[in-house]
Amino acid sequence: EDISTEKASEYYKIKSDEFNKCPKAELMNGIILLMEKIKASGLKILVVTGSAQHTLIRKLTHDLNGLVEENMIVTALDVKHGKPNPEPYLKGLQKAGVKPWEAIIVENAPLGIRAGVAAKVFTIAVNTGPLPDSALLNEGANILFHSIREFAEKWNK
């Protein structure tokens, strides 16, 4: 059923208030190191998230020490279809001004990997959770690492 814009705003405020009460999420171990190596390689960093939380996006740009610019983030508000549809990644390619063969996608979720593969981009799986490796590889990931730190340490190799 459709709800009014006023009611949707009310629900969004409640959701945001609850989100802000949660303990601060820690960055993934090695993410700053990986992003610094990516930047040093001359590549652009773009974040594609299924979130539409403004507070989360502001936190992301702040916590990543300026490694991600706000105009280089694709959120749920930028697309009609989220992952596993490739639209979020295609929008990211457009924002970055690159072709699929000029990009890589780093993903930790099966639906995100499926979206990356559908966008025809080399897709790297990082298993950051309890899923078996096969759950990520079976979606078409080109390579798999077991942590962001492992990926960062192997970046130049």
Label every model-predicted segment:
Residues 1-19, 29, 37:
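A metal-dependent, Asp-based hydrolase signature
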Residues 2, 42-43, 97:
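Residue-level recognition of short, well-ordered coil/turn positions
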Residues 11-16, 44-52, 90, 110-111:
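Short, mixed-charge, low-aromatic patches
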Residues 5, 9, 25, 50, ...:
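Non-catalytic, surface-exposed connector residues within folded enzymatic/regulatory domains
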Residues 20-47:
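Short, acidic loop-to-helix structural element flanking the phosphoryl-transfer center
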Residues 32, 36, 52-157:
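Asp-based, Mg2+/Mn2+-dependent phosphohydrolase catalytic module
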